[in-house]
From Swiss-Prot:
Subcellular location: Cell membrane
EC top class, as a word: translocase
Regions that span the bilayer: 3-23, 28-48, 59-79
Gene3D superfamilies: 1.10.287.3510
Native source species: Mycolicibacterium gilvum (strain PYR-GCK)
This protein's encoding gene: nuoK
Catalytic activity: a quinone + NADH + 5 H(+)(in) = a quinol + NAD(+) + 4 H(+)(out)
The protein, known as: NADH-quinone oxidoreductase subunit K
EC number: 7.1.1.-
Length: 99
């Protein structure tokens, strides 16, 4: 398969993720869209690494997946705390946590 197709797919996934973050108000959906954007970046890194014949992009993608795994643990803990206190996963309710 042509590397351009992978880059187009990466751009499409990133666009879908960005649209989801901007248009949705549910914290869990926004969280999944951010993860989709990170995976789109990983696909682009791996594609560029394959085109140039080195492992740098794959190493960066691996570290990005490690950071994303840590983000999932912390993010879901925060979302669950918001849901327990407000009975809603709406991000507009998250601004009320300061009071």
């Amino acid at each position: 398969m042509n590397p351009d197709n992978y880059l187009y797919l990466s751009a499409l996934l990133f666009t879908i993720g960005a649209a989801g973050v901007l248009l949705r108000r549910n914290a869990i959906v926004m969280f999944m869209c951010v993860e989709l954007m990170l995976n789109a970046g990983n696909l682009a890194f791996v594609t560029f690494a394959r085109v140039h014949g080195n492992l740098d992009g794959q190493v960066v993608a691996f570290f990005t997946m490690v950071v994303a795994a840590c983000e999932v643990v912390i993010g879901l803990a925060i979302i669950m705390t918001i849901f327990r206190t407000r009975r809603s996963a709406n991000v507009d309710a998250a601004s009320l946590l300061r009071h």
